């Protein structure tokens, strides 16, 4: 805490609150943020699953201040050290349940994503979760399964690395992803 402000004071002073944490913590953080925001502040999330979050905040009196988003970009790395300049440019962002967000909150978030060059798709939370499961989450599950199978069956690790070509390396790359991020998904 470099500012000397409490978490609540920091949230109250922010114009935009961005929740970019593992998905299992986002609903609780979203409720906490919505409990503190005023009619001018906006809360967004970056999580890859939306249905549970949508259900939890659906009846919140400040639901309109929330815009559910999922930027469709990531690597097997996580944390601030994984940041990459220009990573989001040209990548799609999904905005979920946009009709539940206040118009001014939605306009601000659309402006941010348009400014950094992200095409916007609009979907319901359910649609987003279904489509993302097929195009993103299944590839991670497959990568984890292959990596675990190879490590279990091929006991001599030096043979794995000596014999494996680019195909194995490419396929299991996602298995390096943080379990803290992927287990809740």
Predicted regions and their residues:
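Internal alpha-helical scaffold of NAD(P)-dependent oxidoreductase catalytic cores
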Residues: 87-177
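Rossmann-like NAD(P)-binding element
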Residues: 8-44
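Rossmann-like NAD(P)(H) cofactor-binding subdomain of soluble oxidoreductases
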Residues: 31-81
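Short acidic-hydrophobic, aromatic-tinged amphipathic segments that line or gate anion-handling sites
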Residues: 2-7, 121-123
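C-terminal active-site/capping subdomain that shapes the small-molecule cofactor and substrate pocket
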Residues: 183-185
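Predominantly a Rossmann-like dinucleotide-binding segment in NAD(P)-dependent oxidoreductases
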Residues: 75-93
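Short, hinge-like loop/turn segments at secondary-structure boundaries
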Residues: 2-4, 60-63, 83-87, 137-141
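Short glycine-rich anion-binding loops that position phosphate/pyrophosphate groups of nucleotides
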Residues: 23-26, 48-49, 147-148
